[in-house]
């Protein structure tokens, strides 16, 4: 059935929501593990004579606007076209672009396949996709097949194992470079910790923990007022809601797994050289009961609220353990339905020491006092990554503490110099596959499931490439 946003959103208001689900099958593990078939691709040159890189954007919500800030904040870029089916975000984005005193881009809107017209009509050096999750793969695949040399896709890049293979196969077949826009990999403390890992301070890597631990209850029932904790807001999800609540909440209704793993696993994967001398071998996942979203609805709207009748399938806390080829283990947690402060819960541990994000702790054997934590800030000042020390002033003006700017700068550097992307199709697939695999494992009572080798054996010889 055609994957349309309209059909997806209609599920939200249907009686007895929750029966749909996004199935994960064994066929996903094997049937798609074949080299991508030749794809028809328009050959479009990278860069015009004026030296400006040509960008297109699909999806014009708040993430798009932050990306536009950084694209236009870096010299040598222009926006050719933008696309969205909703007028409101388009108008906001056009006003946002106008602040930069640059030509207005061409606008594509109307039908849900309008992005295909944009891709076929315009020439781009890069297209950035910041749409609802279920559209990431169809749009990225369409962009690569249309001959766009570089495609940036927001997180998570894919929802199922099949979709992960689609990204890999089409990227390989077309030669287009896919980059997953995982901004946390560029967080300042994360990059400093990565440098410490690479310089051997923690010894041989043994274990990592991470997760997306973020109270999203207001995000999932957002009417545009309630999200900001103002009085008078209403619980909203589905077509009448605001921003992500239009589509994101439905994933909590129909799915049960780690549906948003990349903020945590991306940085840990870089520390473990995943896809570059190491790889994920297997995964097992378990989910708790689901209580948080129902309780939130009852607390805010009463026991008779229509949403109180919805069965939210997503366990409040989903815990996954991954085994790596080189022996390491990783624990990944998804926790978005309960009251809590934000944390990605990083722990990077080796034979000589570790970093723990919560508490800002570092311990290095032989340099730290025995059995006493050091403040991580003291270490991170010494091991600040060169991207941050070079771009700090510009980055501080950007979103998410500057990591969005650093990420876009690194991506644009690859585009302009026609290099492989910092976080490629194999990273996008391996990190995002946790979603589909965790759903499979939970459905089987926590059974161990094998991780596909999206590199088809290349991981043995591939060298680390991120933020060298």
Swiss-Prot record:
Gene Ontology molecular functions: alpha-N-acetylgalactosaminidase activity; nucleotide binding
Cleavable signal peptide: 1-30
Organism: Tannerella forsythia (Bacteroides forsythus)
Keyword Transferase: no
Role: Glycosidase that has specific alpha-N-acetylgalactosaminidase activity.
Residues noted as binding NAD(+) in the record, renumbered to the chain: 62-63, 84, 133-136, 154-155, 183, 243-247, 260
Gene: nagA
Cofactor(s) this protein cannot do without: NAD(+)
Reactions listed under catalytic activity: Cleavage of non-reducing alpha-(1->3)-N-acetylgalactosamine residues from human blood group A and AB mucin glycoproteins, Forssman hapten and blood group A lacto series glycolipids
Family of this protein: Belongs to the Gfo/Idh/MocA family. Glycosyl hydrolase 109 subfamily.
Main enzyme class: hydrolase
Matching PROSITE patterns: TAT
Cofactor binding: number and manner: Binds 1 NAD(+) per subunit. The NAD(+) cannot dissociate.
Pfam families membership: GFO_IDH_MocA, Glyco_hydro_109_C
Post-translational modification: Predicted to be exported by the Tat system. The position of the signal peptide cleavage has not been experimentally proven.
Protein name: Alpha-N-acetylgalactosaminidase
Positions with a binding annotation for substrate: 212, 248, 260-263, 342
Database matches in InterPro entries: Gfo/Idh/MocA-like_OxRdtase_N, Gfo/Idh/MocA_oxidrdct_glycsds, Glyco_hydro_109_C, NAD(P)-bd_dom_sf, TAT_signal, TAT_signal_bac_arc
